[in-house]
Amino acid sequence: MKSLKITALSLVLVLLLAACGAKNDTPDEPAVDPTPEPPIEQPVEKTPDERINDIIAGMSIEEKVGQLFFVRCPETGAVEDVETYHLGGLLLFGRDYKDANGDWLTEDDFTAALASYQDAAAIPLFIGSDEEGGTVTRASKNPNLFSEPLPSPQELYAAGGLDGLLERTLSYNQKLKAFGVNVNFAPVCDVSTNPDNFIYARSFGQDAQTTADYISSVVPVYAQSGVACVLKHFPGYGNNADTHTGIALDARPYTTFEKSDLVPFESGIAAGAPFVLVSHNIVECMDGAYPASLSAKVHTLLRDTLGFTGVIVTDDLAMDAVKAYAQDGCAAVLAIQAGNDMIVTTDYQTQIPQVIAAVQSGEIAESDIDAHVFRVLHEKQALGLID
């Protein structure tokens, strides 16, 4: 019996040893590394130009063409027309600072009106005003907005020198910005020293270089205020007639423009001015066949010779000088073909469909429209209106 127990115990020990041996003979399984997490792709931030191109790619022809119109604010229906015509900008005149009864708008009412226009726009608007000072003022005539109308540059310069002029320009434009105005159709770059000239009272009243020095100093002041400025009236009025009432022929030689009229524009462009407005003068040494606003040659001069890369805008196409010239009523089509980026006009309800039709027919290439829209949106981006 004792022998059986010993035998059984020995068998158990043998089995245990065999099991241990079997376990030790099994090779170790290799360690498995944890599956690495896929790298998180960081979104590539697009450049400002790429963001603009994305916007343009998503726009219809109607939306693109609408962006090229900086129209006189209609007396009624402005909110509806901003949405219907996809307008790029509204230009305010004296009546737009008054209510339906002819009373001056309060600050709150004026600010609310501009905000309502912006609310109607899929792409934020340029909202412009002519606030040159002196004989051409809009906003500052409203005593609810400003304590006094803005004096002319000549008056401000005579009273306080260049520093005084720049200080007043800054303060007035900062107020415009606070109300919702983001483009001022100023300063006047025309060179005029003759009080009998049409443009004299609106000009700086000094020679070309002194005017150029003023322009190069005042352009950064507009930028500081957050309001874009508009150099006007390219290529310079000189002693010409008023194109609001008819065609003005300028027979001066090109050397005169080189030494005088173009000098302030060159200074303003070098200082970073975002807009240049082209006049309706027929400048024979540049293009004797077309008003400057409708002349491809004048626009080539502005782009290629003066190196301007910003927004070119027409003077008001409702002026008699262009009405008489564009007898078929397609002034906006001619203006865009000439190289303008934006059209200032009152009859946009007629002109916009004509431009759309010209694009659809191939008379105006859509690629040209895209280039104009790009410059418009680039400036809206610079003003912080779009990302």
Which residue ranges define each predicted feature?
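Alpha-helix-loop-beta-strand connector modules within alpha/beta enzyme cores
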Residues: 117-123, 206-227, 292-313
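Phosphate/pyrophosphate-binding betaalpha-module
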Residues: 214-233, 260-273
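Short, well-ordered coil/turn segments that N-cap beta-strands
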Residues: 67, 88, 122-126, 181-182, ...
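Preference for extracellular/luminal or secreted protein segments
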Residues: 21-81, 305, 324-387
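C-terminal motif of bacterial Sec signal peptides marking the signal peptidase cleavage site
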Residues: 16-19
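Enzymes and membrane/adaptor proteins characterized by extended Gly/Ser/Thr/Asp/Glu-rich
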Residues: 81-211, 233, 238-251, 279-294, ...
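Bacterial N-terminal signal peptides that target proteins for export
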Residues: 1-8
